[in-house]
């Protein structure tokens, strides 16, 4: 009998390991979703003018018919006879006025025996199903008496739906957030020459009440750029964010602002960038209620005021800016105010640069996170006994999986675009002849080849290892990288890929919008592997390997080997499941 080729030996080893893993994996189909509760009323029937339209885990939303010239009317949210929150609803012309109650924490204290009502005076508004009250289906997690005690002690439901002290009574918050503001003010002024000033809810509280809004949850500031071109404004905002990170601040980039926290991540302020365009109109990425432009001749510069026990900057013509931001009813307190509902205009060209947001956010992530234990995917791949001589860890992060492959005898090259990740990986102290880490833009054509060409030649059998890489880059970058794999992979080389799969719902919108995270359809990856001449060893979807918080993440794994030319080894038994969710180690 002829000696087996190296690829055939790999297949045989992988087949045995695959069988062992498959026997250990238990598969279960997801439980069917419970049927939706039918509505009690005829959907074709006319709806009352004043009503509750939506009840969710986060909010209760509805409309109130008030009349054009009516005074603001108070609506109160009750659990049984306990008044939990109230809003004063200002008239909205001929149309009914919208209202909203934030309810995230309230539901912890309510169960099927409780009755939720929204009342104008003593009269309840009809619920979405037409009844005068709503009862939750889930059991209460805490006694209602605890909610009553917390409200009696002065706590309120803030604009996120959380129970907390009003910000004007929370001295600890005021001291810590104004200390952070002072540090950020100094840094921003040194970097770009501008002072951050109060805006949005913080400015509204300062102007209307002379203190922070009780129901607010953050500290809003902005700086006014001297540039008029949106691209120059965006570039300045990006430079500022990176410079603040270099000074030790935690900085997250969002579409409309940056979130800045101190080194201990105890408090946060939001920093927006404002600018006047060539037409002398103020441009705001977050937007304003008023759609009438705020013009440059209305801007009167900054002044220092006392706010939350500290000296801060605020616009001199503050009332005019507040009226632009919040509209003509800004003097009426409205804890249920909703930007999604009330916003009149926003300047999309003023948004923080989309291409730069993932760069800043991944840098911030690796500056403040470190992981010691290898991932379950590293255990899975190493357990297949593929025995590569070289592992190229693509998007290696802080190199948490590298020690596992080094212990198995492989040399590892870790590549990542984020400087903080590469520096963290290098601090692992692995021997340089066994592991090295380089910064590399894997989306750039030829970048991977350049890194491989710099290694001692000829290269041993290589495993291209990509955990959470294909679901963190754009479609175009993914196509570029797969083309690189196809061009570089030699007979006997291997590829291992793990990505979030279609159907995964654990990604926060911030991860999708600002970090480049996404889910990946495994079908094109499967087709590409076949078209590129790889033989698949593992093709498996599962939700038992990783969690986002307490929720399992739906993943898909591929491990494949490129056969040696001229050899025809038996196709290995594959670990595969597309419709079932398997437990993993």
Pin down the residues of each PLM region:
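A conserved beta-strand element that flanks and buttresses the S-adenosyl-L-methionine
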Residues: 465
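Short catalytic micro-motifs in class I SAM-dependent methyltransferases
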Residues: 468-469
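Beta-strand-enriched, solvent-exposed domains that form extended recognition/catalytic surfaces
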Residues: 40-141
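Active-site nucleotide-donor binding segment shared across nucleotidyl transfer reactions
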Residues: 188-217
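Class I (Rossmann-like) S-adenosyl-L-methionine-dependent methyltransferase catalytic domain
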Residues: 357-389, 394-457, 473-479, 484, ...
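Catalytic metal-binding acidic patch
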Residues: 210-230, 309
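Conserved catalytic core of two-metal-ion nucleotidyltransferases
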Residues: 240-295, 299-315, 320-321, 344-355
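Helical scaffold of the NTase/Pol beta-like nucleotidyltransferase catalytic core
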Residues: 110-199
């Amino acid at each position: 009998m002829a000696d087996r080729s190296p690829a055939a030996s790999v297949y045989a080893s992988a087949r045995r390991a695959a069988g062992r893993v498959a026997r250990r994996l238990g598969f279960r189909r997801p439980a069917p979703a419970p049927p939706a509760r039918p509505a009690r009323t005829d959907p074709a029937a006319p709806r009352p003018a004043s009503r509750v339209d939506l009840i969710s885990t986060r909010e209760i939303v509805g409309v109130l018919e008030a009349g054009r010239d009516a005074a603001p009317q108070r609506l109160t949210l009750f659990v049984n006879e306990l008044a939990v929150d109230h809003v004063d609803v200002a008239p909205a012309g001929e149309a009914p006025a919208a209202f909203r109650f934030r309810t995230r924490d309230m539901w912890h204290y309510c169960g099927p025996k409780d009755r939720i009502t929204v009342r104008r005076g003593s009269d309840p508004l009809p619920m979405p199903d037409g009844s005068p009250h709503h009862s939750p289906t889930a059991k209460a997690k805490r006694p209602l008496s605890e909610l009553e005690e917390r409200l009696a002690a002065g706590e309120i439901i803030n604009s996120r739906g959380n129970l907390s002290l009003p910000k004007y009574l929370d001295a600890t918050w005021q001291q810590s957030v104004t200390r952070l503001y002072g540090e950020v003010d100094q840094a921003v002024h040194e970097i770009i020459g501008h002072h951050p000033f109060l805006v949005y809810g913080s400015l509204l509280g300062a102007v209307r009440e002379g203190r922070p809004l009780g129901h607010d949850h953050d500290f809003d500031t902005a700086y006014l750029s001297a540039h008029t071109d949106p691209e120059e404004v965006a570039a300045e905002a990006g430079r500022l964010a990176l410079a603040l990170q270099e000074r030790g601040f935690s900085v997250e980039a969002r579409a409309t602002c940056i979130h800045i926290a101190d080194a201990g991540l105890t408090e946060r302020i939001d920093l927006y960038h404002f600018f006047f365009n060539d037409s002398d109109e103020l441009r705001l990425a977050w937007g304003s209620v008023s759609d009438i432009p705020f013009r440059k001749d209305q801007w009167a510069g900054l002044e220092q005021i006392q706010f939350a026990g500290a000296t801060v900057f605020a616009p001199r013509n503050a009332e005019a800016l507040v009226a632009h931001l919040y509209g003509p009813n800004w003097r009426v307190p409205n804890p249920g105010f909703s930007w999604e509902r009330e916003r009149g205009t926003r300047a999309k060209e003023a948004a923080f640069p989309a291409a730069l947001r993932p760069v800043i956010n991944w840098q911030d992530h690796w500056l403040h996170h470190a992981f010691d234990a290898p991932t379950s995917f590293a255990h899975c791949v190493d357990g297949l006994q593929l025995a590569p001589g070289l592992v190229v860890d693509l998007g290696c992060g802080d190199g948490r999986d590298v020690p596992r492959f080094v212990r198995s005898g492989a040399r590892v090259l870790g590549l990542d675009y984020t400087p903080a990740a590469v520096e963290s990986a290098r601090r692992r102290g692995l021997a340089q002849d066994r592991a090295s880490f380089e910064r590399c833009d894997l989306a750039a054509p030829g970048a991977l080849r350049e890194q491989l060409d710099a290694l001692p030649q000829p290269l041993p059998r290589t495993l291209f290892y990509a955990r959470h890489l294909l679901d963190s880059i754009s479609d175009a970058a993914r196509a570029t990288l797969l083309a690189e794999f196809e061009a570089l992979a030699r007979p006997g080389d291997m590829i291992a890929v793990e990505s979030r799969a279609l159907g995964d719902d654990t990604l926060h919108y911030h991860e999708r919008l600002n970090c480049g995270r996404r889910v990946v359809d495994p079908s094109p990856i499967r087709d590409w592997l076949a078209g590129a001449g790889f033989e698949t060893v593992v093709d498996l979807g599962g939700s038992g390997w990783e969690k986002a918080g307490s929720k399992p993440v739906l993943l898909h794994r591929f491990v494949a080997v490129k056969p040696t030319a001229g050899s025809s080894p038996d196709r290995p038994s594959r670990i595969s499941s597309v419709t079932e969710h398997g437990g993993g180690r």
